[in-house]
């Protein structure tokens, strides 16, 4: 009779693990090297964001959204601003829409660059993150030149954007596009055909399209499994319906397909950015960049120096805030990680009655057990990397 040793381990992956992307704790049950169960423990970065928003005016709630997915801050603000605008029933001018779309796509590139390069680092490639961060640095400077802040911009406000873009900045963003595509080709050359990178990602973390819908996936996760579902095309907001871009889809639903989709999406984002830059320098060169009804957007500084009414108006907007008609609304945007939704309930006062945040990463993380079961221990880091989890939005 042969003796067979059963080697069952229970190990902790994180919360201080470099591949855990923040403060994730996974409790893994292993049979030798094979993963039998993955139990994500979340809540280590919980700050009570949704409850805090209920105590702030509609304008004061904006900065909380920067701190959710802090890799692409403006995309989160976008969903909130659209929700408030929907309740107020206001339209924002075309220049404001173009600026928003431009910076949303910058956010998408920021997020995908970080994800693609750090996922490469998780499986052992050390060069891509250095190249990726070099490009992200330039984009952070564009954030800073628009809003004064590199990360927590609070730039998209209900009613438009906080301030106009100088023409030189728009030109510089246009000039950045082509050299970036060259840098992207370099990362592409390094990873896409790389034997080791492919062995670590092809046929790992496969999800069928039915499972995607069942788990509530969105964004790259759904497109990797073959559905051309993108809110920018399916439920267009701002001026996306006037812009030309393609939606890449995968056919295997594995880590490698998701990586390829993120690479193509960055190129498509550049394509959208070029169209926005062209319009901001031609037909939308001048004009208002935020709502002009004066009920939501504070008066200009110059006006406040001359007019007492403007000063009083400014004071009221920043102390009491504006009252939003009672009602409820759900607004979603195609954030880099998936469908980022804001469910906003107003009771007619100057503060939200309830603000539910639907973070895409939350739905993706809960499928860790389903995706990793039966894989090797080393694949857990690769699967986690391809989900693109950021803990600010998961724990809120």
From Swiss-Prot:
GO terms for cellular component: plasma membrane. Its EC number is 7.1.1.-. Pfam families: Complex1_49kDa. Transmembrane segments: none annotated. GO terms for molecular function: NAD binding; NADH:ubiquinone reductase (non-electrogenic) activity; quinone binding. It is found in: Cell inner membrane. Keywords: Cell inner membrane, Cell membrane, Membrane, NAD, Quinone, Translocase, Transport, Ubiquinone. Its main location: membrane. It catalyses: a quinone + NADH + 5 H(+)(in) = a quinol + NAD(+) + 4 H(+)(out). This is NADH-quinone oxidoreductase subunit D 1. It comes from Rhizobium etli (strain ATCC 51251 / DSM 11541 / JCM 21823 / NBRC 15573 / CFN 42).
């Amino acid at each position: 009779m042969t003796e067979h040793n059963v080697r069952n381990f229970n190990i902790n992956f994180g919360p201080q693990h470099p591949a855990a992307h923040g403060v994730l704790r996974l409790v893994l049950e292993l049979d030798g090297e094979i993963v039998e169960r993955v139990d994500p423990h979340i809540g280590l970065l919980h700050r009570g964001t949704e409850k805090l928003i209920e105590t702030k005016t509609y304008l004061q709630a904006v900065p909380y959204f920067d701190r959710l997915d802090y890799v692409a801050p403006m995309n989160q603000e976008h969903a909130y601003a659209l929700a408030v605008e929907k309740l107020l029933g206001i339209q924002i001018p075309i220049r404001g829409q173009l600026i928003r779309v431009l910076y949303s796509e910058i956010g998408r590139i920021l997020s995908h660059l970080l994800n693609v390069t750090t996922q490469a680092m998780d499986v052992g490639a050390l060069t891509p993150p250095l190249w990726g961060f070099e490009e992200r640095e330039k984009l952070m400077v564009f954030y800073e030149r628009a809003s004064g802040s590199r990360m927590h911009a609070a730039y998209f406000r209900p009613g438009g954007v906080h301030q106009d873009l100088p023409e030189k900045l728009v030109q510089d963003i246009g000039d950045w596009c082509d050299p970036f595509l060259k840098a992207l080709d370099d990362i592409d050359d390094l990873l896409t055909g790389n034997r080791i990178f492919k062995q670590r990602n092809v046929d790992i973390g496969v999800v069928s399209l039915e499972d995607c819908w069942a788990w509530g996936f969105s964004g790259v996760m759904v497109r990797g499994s073959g559905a051309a579902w993108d809110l920018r095309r399916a439920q267009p907001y701002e001026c996306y319906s006037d812009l030309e871009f393609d939606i890449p889809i995968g056919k295997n639903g594995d880590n490698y397909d998701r990586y390829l989709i993120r690479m193509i999406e960055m190129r498509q984002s550049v394509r959208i950015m070029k169209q926005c830059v062209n319009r901001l320098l031609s037909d939308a060169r001048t004009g208002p960049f935020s709502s002009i009804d004066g009920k939501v957007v504070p008066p200009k500084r110059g006006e406040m120096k001359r007019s007492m009414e403007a000063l009083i108006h400014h004071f009221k907007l920043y102390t009491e805030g504006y009252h939003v008609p009672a009602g409820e609304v759900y607004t979603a945007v195609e954030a880099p990680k998936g469908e980022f939704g804001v469910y906003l309930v107003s009771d007619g006062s100057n503060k939200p009655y309830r603000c539910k945040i639907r973070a895409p990463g939350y739905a993706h993380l809960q499928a860790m057990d389903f995706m990793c079961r039966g894989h090797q221990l080393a694949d857990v880091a690769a699967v986690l990397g391809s989900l693109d989890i950021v803990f600010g939005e998961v724990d809120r």
